[in-house]
Amino acid sequence: MTSNKSNHELPEPIDALYRIKRGLSGYVSYLAACEMNESFSEYVLYEPILRILTARGYSVECEVECPGVKHEKKGDRKRLDFVATRNGLAFALEVKWANRRSIDIKQDVLKLVAYRTASNSARAFLCVFGRQSILMNLRLKAENLEQQGQIVTADLGKTKYSCRIYEQKSPNKSQRVTR
């Protein structure tokens, strides 16, 4: 696996997020070796994310109703993929499998913004996973997203899988352009 940064002694939740990037890249490479490619979707990523977060001591809820989102109809509830808490630290994580260089993340970002607004000190992240050839040239059409750390890629000789994580930042914070 390749990454351009040493990750010793990272603070939480950044350490857990780095482990998620490493874990997902290797896990999906393993599934590809098992010829499981037909079943690939973002849902394949849920179990390893849950395992990594719980191994890091987080209490994790999946498919959590998103606070602060108005619901159009009865039963039409927007849900966050993950909400993790540990020692007063809380964050939401939305997961997206990128099949092309330009992906629709509008609903994911709306949920992350609503979560941050409803949860004063909480953080919110978007995990984007896919083939390295796609993630290296990924175009996200959203403001206030800042990449956390470097892209992580499992380079095992066949298809290379990569993972990036972005933090949803408040509009009043300085922004930097990321790919």
Please place each PLM-identified region on the residue numbering.
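Interdomain/boundary linker segments immediately adjacent to catalytic/signaling cores
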Residues: 1-55
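Short, charged, amphipathic alpha-helix that recurs within catalytic cores of restriction-modification
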Residues: 103-127, 134
